């Protein structure tokens, strides 16, 4: 079929996709969260911003004439015999065009490669754990850092929210910059590789097959594409992508599979061109892990230091380049240590030799108590003296080695260890088993002593729970006590796979202990702790006008029988009862306010029967006042 037909259908499908999206959101988002389902348009699972939409519409109109010219040129080529020359352009020859499918717009990149995140409460514990594993996968190979959003931190105003929307798997590309932006993980999308792919869009990646030079590496089989989905195979404009010196990556986790949007599972929509040497078509569309090209590209996009890395294990060691030999001057190395929330980090130096200077100005090692360069400074070191051991206040440390040109030193060597447990004096936070969300380590014992401000109690809510099962929990377990002593009252000992009920202390202290033996290891647990107060014990009962019911982390207002809660959630109003007229198999419902004093009149034929909301049948109606057998309410019935 004529290529013009496919170009036209593709253009129409793309325009339609930009103007409509059918479906209702599964998870309601607040107005200040940008939902990808309400985007101006879509390219596959990519949600387009209004700016993206305008750019694509302008480009679509501009390229329509170019499509026609290209067709004419190809026809002329066939008649002149030059078509054979075009076909002989190999992949190797095309490598001179280095364009990568990542955002070219600096404002779309996350500041200092830090991406704050939230996870909606509608996800299960195993899903939340998998999201964290996907984020750790990106952290493990790049300088990108995912941190749980702190609403009090203005640096976290721009953040992502994992949610479940009607668009299924979809996300914006890069940072929108106007507050919260949703990452939809819909039905059948909650798989590790798919989430890593969606996070690729968050980082700033477009789909690999949309690069401007893609036609040199893959062919699009238009006739096999589902009608209306042709726009997903458009080539991006060079203004949207950055030329970072990387060639086409068939192995990218951002690449479509051969049958994506295909009319049939065995029909190709994208066909990789054969390797000129082996004659084999490369595999595409993997959803297992970041490719080497993905890793290189992300580090180039965020200008990650070439020296250093992110350390995610519970224990480890690291050193300056070439240790114990001298490393070259004029280097910047950054190490990011991240352990399980609820743990702290013990850092010890085993060797240290840097060129000294006043204030350690030229060559230094800096250690910061947090996830980035703006975290509180724990120390700046130089010279030949071994620094004292360092203990973090939380689960992250940031270490930077800076050396000036023409100054050579041996550098340093250090090891670290995650310390689980400890004293916690915060109003809220998270406790997790060591190595969570991966399996916990054997032979571990962690004791957390939580203290809240006076006049508050401690609330504990488990989000996920998978501990080796035993009838009496003698092997691996989580134990909670109402106080800080081993002799404090036992609230419960938990193991197995069922999430324990919410827990609260009677005072402002709680002890949480995790124990694992040397054999079976499971996924562990994640629990949120927070300050808890009995609002119902306050003089105003939390504002409730009738009944106050205290719950973990909150409270609710309720009403006595015969009353119902008003729209403000605090006051009670006289309840309405439903009465039914039952006749000839038909039950029309009448909503009649329940009288406290006085009467209500219901009219009907003598053959009708009257029942209350409890469906207790009365005698045939007569002209008299009747007391209902199932209620004390007086009703006047007239015939």
From Swiss-Prot:
User: Which tissues carry this protein?
Assistant: Ectodermal and primary mesenchyme cells in hatched blastula.
Which residues bear sugar attachments? 122, 140, 317, 455
Signal sequence coordinates: 1-23
> Which domain of life, per UniProt?
Eukaryota
Q: What molecular function terms (GO) are annotated for this protein? A: calcium ion binding; metalloendopeptidase activity; zinc ion binding
Cofactor annotation comment: Binds 1 zinc ion per subunit.
Q: What is this protein called?
A: Bone morphogenetic protein 1 homolog
Source organism of the structure: Strongylocentrotus purpuratus
